[in-house]
């Protein structure tokens, strides 16, 4: 059974597939280079790579640099190159901006900056962490402990004995200063002893005190504790050499202070007041009740206030500020905090057209000690990455996520240890039975998604807000992750890469509303060999629904800018791997992979802004700034796009005597350079006369110049298809002899279609745009037309290849196709 059949290809929107031809969609091809899949325009040429500026005219940059973008706001967009020992910054017009390295230059030392340097932007700061550096604690410590004691007299009681006994290791015996309070029977003489300040003064000075009334029945003496022998009655703790030779004594109202000489800590001090030390007590190093601190003290005194027995985490330190005021402070001989030279540094936008790279003064520990206000867990470890989330700077180290204090991007320590505040720093580990090192993060579904090599974690909270007591890191999925490529977010999706044999897989990660779980679909499942293994960057442009993957070639031996006289060459480094997608009311109706090739160029990195992609590119023997407009707009003057790489607009000078126009190429001599009249759109051959100077015949003062590039679409093998529950299914039984294929095109210039039968010569069909008798066929302007080109094939469906090619500067829009052939099948399908 047989007959003539025809089948429509409604569009070419879904790029390429590396599946077998029978598994491909009807609107997928086998190869697509330098073409764009657009929902409105169909299959068209990719946008040109516009030349903006030469970033460095004398140096090329190795692929080991760390490319970074700074996007402060619409008016502050910058490209940055970090390399071994230095950093350079350019605006998006290609102007290099001055960078002062004020301090910390050694932090930029790296044999592989692309791998070692991890960055995050926060306002005018770009924080940079060097993965090769181990973070250390500051060796500078707080003030050393003062070996001191206080005697605090708080109440007075008649008839009681107030006694203080001190013993220093260098003393031969303990010395006791005792005051026998008067009975209170003679108020005229006894009332002076009611003041606690007077009691302290008498213990300090003996009967020489102005407050000792000898007419009372009070008694004072300074005695040896071992024998009870009286040493003095006129001298006390602060005036007798028996004590002052070993202690530096001072007094305040109601308070006596003693400091052990030479810092010797092996001394004792005992008090007795006849009332169980409720009227007078000593304080040495610590106290359990904050309210018992003396009202007066020295401003260099620090006392630990202890919490519950056995709970060292409830201890805190206070320092005397002024009368009656003790303020929480850091303990004695405690590391002040972090070693700034090993911590992340910053590139700072000075908002005057200049930048400064410098070491950061990270906030010191101001309270507690190494237990109650411990170092963040990244100390003595290497930093894996940086992030910013909910007004906190974050650090990933080992399996921990560490956040600064809320809105305080330089502080990793609590400001009080007496309570846990919601704004305090956060330090949590990823949950799970295995230790999973955290490498990266991305904002996702109103939360933060973190990546280890084998799992994903979501930052959550057991309360309404994320705080030190409520934050949790729960595993939400278990996909392998390539930590060489930073994940990106796009709307409600996140994209991340995986290593797959010698290639790269990319997953589209999403929250499944039906199952309330997270999942990740492999969007490269049909193009498993497309993206090479050395992928290093994903670029997301949500304005134009485009994802771009960049890959490098073998790592350069250079780690800083260098001079070369040899033009750069590349294998993968000049290629952009393009994923075009489109959602219609929540349903994905387009998923198209292709590649854009920038010949003889090495792309170092890119950034997305609005509908544009900006690339830092080594081309020739220097480094350039390239701009791609993903909208692929038509030129408003000539009515169509001009498709040239390194495209730029130049002004020519016309000489009527020679009938030549002269112009200067901003990027020097280029093989294959052509000129396009920006008024009529015609192309002209140019002649290089000297240096960067070119000429062309005629008067053409407004010009586009650039290098033509070739666009190629290889059509998939065609099959007769029938509808099933899975869509159109290819029928492989029978013989399908294709007679011709008709392509419908819109507003296109020159292109050609090549048919190459197996074992036979290639035949060509040309669309030159000229259709006799139509309004679009005019002399002196490029031929642009719409219509249908019918290509004869006369081959079995599996015995030929069909390529659509164009190297013209003119546009090409292929809308759809119609395949006509003869199909014969000996059997009938049931």
Language-model segments: residues:
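Beta-propeller and closely related beta-pinwheel folds
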Residues: 53-59, 361-391, 396-546, 550-608, ...
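Beta-sheet repeat architectures centered on beta-propellers
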Residues: 7-76, 502-830
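WD40 beta-propeller blade core
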Residues: 88, 457-458, 626
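Long, charge-dense tracts
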Residues: 125, 131, 145-154, 180-377
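Elongated alpha-helical scaffolds
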Residues: 114-135, 448-451, 458
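A short, polar beta-strand/turn micro-motif
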Residues: 137-150, 463-482, 709-727
